């Protein structure tokens, strides 16, 4: 009889596995063992855990990245980068060495197949880890400076990368910065810090500064409004310093009779001069090397001023673009139109002028010897009467503001100089506007004299505490000299001027004519004597006296070739009445002769040069005279009407 097995217990899968452990073990041992290399994530994670083997590999990788640029084959580069471009989340402060090695890689040495992943890695790294945000910004902003090489013997500057590759790197850097700002808006201040730190040194070639400045202008397309003003200030501070340095170099060359020529006349383009000098690269003297640097500086200032004007034009209303459509064809704005990156919370277009106005106060009013950069504001105000009105009102408020520190007093004096420059030089400032402001200035001067100039026994003229008064006085004299021809043609204006009693200020114990610019004083004296307003020539000292203020004359000359086509139509030449021409010529010729004691400079002064002060219609009245003297802008020559001898009254021929 067979035993039934229906009720026999069945083994579960667990019991089955336990019943044959040897079989499982033999199957595992039968598989061949392969030593797989650890991935980049595993190396980093184990290194952070303190694993010794991982620490050794970590150091080897960091050392290998130092020689990354020397590798000829792309395969090992791709293999190495593949290990780390996807593990930005695994990085932290203890992996700083590895991160710095990756950030320092030259972008042109990274294979094109992984360059996009490398870009995304930098974005993710800056967004995820606060400790690396500034490091990423610094490395990326450095890529906004063009890569160049300089031959020390000849000073010839050559680009390391092609224009196409360099522009690709610029675009990649802007993409990274804009992406990080969009995801991490609070990092804007860290970006600003890097922008200021990466600014090329003054000893670097001008082409690097020009390229960096253009990228900072493009950055305005996407950076938040909270740092937009600060970036513009960084741009204008550097431009003002370079402009001042260029002015000092030109003045030193005039005094030392250096053979260096900048060749800034109409017939010779700056670009042609530079190319002509760089051909003879075998034997370059120190003088030629210095000349080449000066020409590069002029090109750089011209290029950046043109770029800023281009940005301003792209930001104004379309109505202005339509009115000046022909002018836009002359403007190379392709670099700006092709830039498509935008950002959130950028500076509104209508706020751009207010930002520039603040930058003028913070960077330009204390910059004494700036020649060219200040013309940017002259151009900006020409686009709208509202801009012109805002500018004049703001400058006047800064002028009469109560100073709390010596720097505030200098700023007030600078504001008075700019106010005078706008009223005297800008063609778009109407006669009525200039007269209204001139009357406002005179009323302030009269009140100042009544308050501080009464009681001659207690007044010591020429003190620095009265510096603002003397700067405003010079502004009054300058504007009157430039615009009196228009005022006297209006009987009501002329009668109003006679009622002012200008002698009340001129003959006050503060003696303003004694402490202002001598050419301005002589010109004002000759004009007022001709109009029988006041006789004051005897007040002007023969010898130069120390001025209690830092005088400046914005918009006095403009020799930058490319951007001059936007500036020269806005400028007003000094144009007296025809009957006053001979008197003014004698006064200014006498001043030029005494300013330069040399016999050669005295012989250069001729009566025909006085015609530089005339417009074309006045020149016709002089009986067929040629009217204009062809100017040569050489630093080794001196002329009757030059910036150093007769500031404020320089003719405007380019």
Swiss-Prot record:
Compositional bias segments (type: Basic and acidic residues): 13-31
Keyword set, alphabetical order: Nucleus, Transcription, Transcription regulation
Sequence segments annotated as region (Disordered): 1-37
GO terms for biological process, alphabetical: transcription initiation at RNA polymerase I promoter
Highest rank taxon of the organism: Eukaryota
Cell compartments where the protein resides: Nucleus, Nucleolus
Pfam family, one: RRN3
GO cellular component, one term: nucleolus
Residues annotated as signal peptide: none
Major site of localization recorded for this protein: nucleus
GO function term, MF aspect, one: RNA polymerase I general transcription initiation factor activity
Family label: Belongs to the RRN3 family.
Family matches, as PANTHER family: RNA POLYMERASE I-SPECIFIC TRANSCRIPTION INITIATION FACTOR RRN3-RELATED, TRANSCRIPTION INITIATION FACTOR IA RRN3
Described purpose of this protein according to its UniProt entry: Required for efficient transcription initiation by RNA polymerase I (Pol I).
Entry protein name: RNA polymerase I-specific transcription initiation factor tif-1A
Gene source species: Caenorhabditis elegans
């Amino acid at each position: 009889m067979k035993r039934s097995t229906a009720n026999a217990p069945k083994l579960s899968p667990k019991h089955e596995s336990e019943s044959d452990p040897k079989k499982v073990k033999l199957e595992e041992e039968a598989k061949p063992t392969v030593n797989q290399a650890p991935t980049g994530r595993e190396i980093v994670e184990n290194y952070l855990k303190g694993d010794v083997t991982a620490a050794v590999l970590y150091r080897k990788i960091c050392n290998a990245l130092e020689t990354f640029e020397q590798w000829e084959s792309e395969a090992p580069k791709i293999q190495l980068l593949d290990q780390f471009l996807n593990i930005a989340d695994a990085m932290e402060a203890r992996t700083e060495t590895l991160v710095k090695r990756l950030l320092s890689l030259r972008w042109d040495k990274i294979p094109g197949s992984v360059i996009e992943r490398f870009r995304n890695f930098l974005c993710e790294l800056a967004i995820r880890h606060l400790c690396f945000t500034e490091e990423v910004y610094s490395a990326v902003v450095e890529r906004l400076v063009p890569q160049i090489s300089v031959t020390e013997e000849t000073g010839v500057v050559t680009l390391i990368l092609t224009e196409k590759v360099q522009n690709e790197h610029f675009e990649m850097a802007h993409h990274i910065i804009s992406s990080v700002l969009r995801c991490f808006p609070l990092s804007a201040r860290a970006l600003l810090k890097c922008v200021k730190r990466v600014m090329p040194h003054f000893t670097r070639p001008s082409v690097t500064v020009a390229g960096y400045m253009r990228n900072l202008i493009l950055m305005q397309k996407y950076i938040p409004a909270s740092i937009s003003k600060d970036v513009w200030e960084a741009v204008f501070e550097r431009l003002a310093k370079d402009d001042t340095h260029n002015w000092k170099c030109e003045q030193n060359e005039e005094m030392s009779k250096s053979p260096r020529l900048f060749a800034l006349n109409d017939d010779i383009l700056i670009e042609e001069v530079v190319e002509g000098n760089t051909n003879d690269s075998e034997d370059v003297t120190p003088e030629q090397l210095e000349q080449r640097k000066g020409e590069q500086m002029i090109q750089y200032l011209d290029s950046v001023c043109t770029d800023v004007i281009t940005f301003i034009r792209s930001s104004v209303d379309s109505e202005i673009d339509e009115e000046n459509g022909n002018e836009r064809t002359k403007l190379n704005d392709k670099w700006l139109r092709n830039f498509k990156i935008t950002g959130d919370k950028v500076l509104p277009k209508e706020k751009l002028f207010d930002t520039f106005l603040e930058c003028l106060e913070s960077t330009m009013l204390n910059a004494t010897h700036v020649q060219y950069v200040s013309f940017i504001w002259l151009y900006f105000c020409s686009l709208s009467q509202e801009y012109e009105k805002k500018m004049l009102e703001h400058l006047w408020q800064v002028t009469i503001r109560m100073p709390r520190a010596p720097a505030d007093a200098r700023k007030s004096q600078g504001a008075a100089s700019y106010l005078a420059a706008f009223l005297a030089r800008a063609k778009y400032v109407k006669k009525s506007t200039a007269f209204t402001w001139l009357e406002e200035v005179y009323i302030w001067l009269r009140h100042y004299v009544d308050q501080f100039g009464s009681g001659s026994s207690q007044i010591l003229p020429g003190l620095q505490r009265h510096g603002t008064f003397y700067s405003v006085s010079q502004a009054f004299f300058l504007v009157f000299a430039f615009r009196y021809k228009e005022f006297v043609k209006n009987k009501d204006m002329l009668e109003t001027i006679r009622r002012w009693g200008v002698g009340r200020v001129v003959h006050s114990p503060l003696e303003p004519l004694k402490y202002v610019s001598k050419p301005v004083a002589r010109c004002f004296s000759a004009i007022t004597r001709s109009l029988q307003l006041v006789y004051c020539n005897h007040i002007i000292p023969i010898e130069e006296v120390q001025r209690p203020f830092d005088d400046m004359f914005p918009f006095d000359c403009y020799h930058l070739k490319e951007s001059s086509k936007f500036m020269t139509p806005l400028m007003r030449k000094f144009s007296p009445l025809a009957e006053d021409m001979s008197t003014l010529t004698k006064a200014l010729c006498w001043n030029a002769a005494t300013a330069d004691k040399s016999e050669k400079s005295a012989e250069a002064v001729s009566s025909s040069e006085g015609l530089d002060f005339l417009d074309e219609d006045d020149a016709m009245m002089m009986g067929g005279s040629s009217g204009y003297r062809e100017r040569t802008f050489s630093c080794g020559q001196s002329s009757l009407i030059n910036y150093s001898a007769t500031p404020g009254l320089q003719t405007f021929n380019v």
